[in-house]
From Swiss-Prot:
The active site is at D287. The gene is ubiD. This is 3-octaprenyl-4-hydroxybenzoate carboxy-lyase. GO terms for molecular function: 3-octaprenyl-4-hydroxybenzoate carboxy-lyase activity; metal ion binding. The lineage of its organism: Bacteria, Pseudomonadati, Pseudomonadota, Gammaproteobacteria, Alteromonadales. One of its GO terms (biological process) is ubiquinone biosynthetic process. Prenylated FMN binds at I175, Y176, R177, R189, W190, L191, R194, G195. Mn(2+) binds at N172, E238. Keywords: Cell membrane, Decarboxylase, Flavoprotein, FMN, Lyase, Manganese, Membrane, Metal-binding, Ubiquinone biosynthesis.
């Protein structure tokens, strides 16, 4: 099942007991965060706050608060089915030539899918049913959440930011938090390596001093939202990838103030520009690490137009110490990464980003070890293969007899198969998450790799331990008489 807009997904969730409407008045200032956090930690439903205090616009929260709902958004029943998305991405990143006629025939469905990518432009879109310009532009009328007591101001969290570089044919979609600064101003917090910031840097170089057009979509269809947080190949637009996942082209429309294309079914669209000479201090805000982050200067986004559907829904979230919604997204998207990594490194058995590691700061990889030093090669490969892992601080590599998703297994492997000096890799002066205050320098820190695999000749001179395993025949016999033993 595919969803053309957010509302059809809301209806689907409600019909399946995955969404709860809350009619009791709830304040976007702190109260929504507390409720959403309690519900998410209980693995509860998405929430639709129908009567936000001092606002008439409903607020949707916890939309992707469980891996199951992430899978449902992509038309899947089980998060493990998201590996199909990973297989598709792996193919798109490195398409293999057919090995023969039969192989060519088998690849036809995937090639047909790829041809279904370009977005479809529509007229009279739902997202432009109501248009506000000039003095009517007032961001304070939106029920923007103020998530934590130490936050400096309300924060737009699920804005899908749309940009285009002057030398690129495709648009970029990214999700960057945006601090409310005034009736028509937000602070665009994008880090220098992110797609939107790179597009902006290219524009400033080619058109110094000129205003840079930017559009932010709120409440887009779930597939387009997830397309913006998936490792899409650089040459492909997120719109095209969303169409690929949906099985039909993404419907877009032209923005009113510029040539950028926006998701036509979105609930709310913010159009405007960034003046390269206007910056503002952003933060502090509570973040996905569980701490308030440092402040820094970022570009100011001036909103000139607000368009929206009739009776729009405001899509929001909060970030905090895991588990939070980004952590749940990370758990689901973990399954997308597995086939992509296996394509490059077939020896990888499984890959796990524990949610306690703030979505990406720690990874555990199980491999079918084939030679001395193999674990170290896999570490280096994981750090460098996808941009998503450039901020991963710790990588643990284990053998294929260890379940990399079971901390009992992983800790056993670390404590029995590692010598701290021999089997630890330390790398200095590497890119680190800007929000990581533990690093000695902002954006620059170290990485640690832990080789918790069995050691081969050349890696040790000692006789290696043999794991204790019960005789299979004995296990089979005990299984057969277990009920007669009377042990519960």
């Amino acid at each position: 099942m595919s969803f053309k807009d957010l509302r059809s997904f809301i209806d689907h969730l409600e019909a399946n007991g995955e969404l709860k409407r809350i009619s009791y008045p709830v304040d976007p200032h702190l109260e929504m965060t507390e409720i959403a956090d309690r519900v998410l930690r209980a693995q509860g439903p998405a929430l639709l706050f129908e009567n936000p205090t001092n606002h008439s616009m409903p607020v949707l929260a916890n939309l992707f608060g469980t891996p199951k709902r992430v899978a449902m958004a992509l038309g899947k029943d089980d998060p493990l089915a998201l590996r199909e998305v990973g297989e598709l991405l792996a193919f798109l990143k490195e398409p293999e030539p057919p090995r023969g006629f039969k192989d060519a025939i088998s690849k036809i469905p995937m090639f047909k899918q790829a041809l279904n990518m370009p977005p479809k432009t529509v007229r009279n879109p739902a997202c432009q049913q109501v248009v506000k310009t000039g003095d009517d532009v007032d961001l304070t009328q939106l029920p923007i959440q103020h998530c934590w007591p130490g936050d400096v101001a309300p924060l737009v969290t699920w804005g899908l930011t749309i940009t285009k570089g002057p030398r690129k044919s495709r648009q970029n979609l990214g999700i960057y938090r945006q601090q409310l600064l005034g009736k028509n101003k937000l602070i665009m917090r994008w880090l220098s390596h992110r797609g939107g910031a790179l597009d902006f840097a290219d524009f400033k170089e080619q058109f110094p001093g000129e205003r840079y057009p930017v559009v932010v979509a709120l409440g887009s269809d779930p597939v387009t939202i997830l397309g913006a947080v998936t490792p899409v190949p650089d040459a492909m637009s997120e719109y095209a990838f969303a169409g690929l996942l949906r099985g039909e082209r993404t419907e877009v429309c032209k923005a009113l103030s510029c040539d950028l294309e926006v998701p036509a079914s979105s609930e709310i669209i913010l159009e405007g520009y960034i003046d390269p000479n206007e910056m503002a201090e952003e933060g502090p805000y509570g973040d996905h690490t569980g701490y308030y982050n440092e402040t820094d200067k970022f570009p100011v986004f001036t909103v000139t137009h607000i368009t929206h559907r009739k009776d729009p829904i405001y899509h929001s979230t909060y970030t905090g110490r895991p588990p939070d919604e980004p952590a749940m997204l990370g758990v689901a998207l973990n399954e997308v990464f597995v086939p992509i990594l296996r394509k490059q490194y077939p020896e990888i058995i499984d890959f796990y980003l524990p949610p306690e590691g703030c979505s990406y700061r720690m990874a555990v990889i199980s491999i079918r070890k084939q030679y001395p030093g193999h674990a170290k090669r896999v570490m280096m490969g994981a750090w460098s293969f996808l941009r998503q892992f450039m901020y991963t601080k710790f990588i643990v590599v284990v053998d294929d007899d260890v379940n990399c998703r079971d901390w009992n297994d992983v800790i056993w492997a670390i404590t029995t198969r590692m010598d701290p000096k021999r089997d630890t890799v330390m790398i200095d002066n590497t890119p680190i998450d800007y929000l990581d205050f533990a690093s000695p320098v902002v954006g620059l820190g170290s990485k640690m790799g832990l080789d918790a695999t069995n050691k081969w000749e050349g890696e040790t001179n000692r006789e290696w331990g043999t794991p204790i395993v019960m005789d299979p025949k004995v296990k089979q016999k005990i299984d057969s008489i277990w009920d007669e033993l009377g042990i519960s």
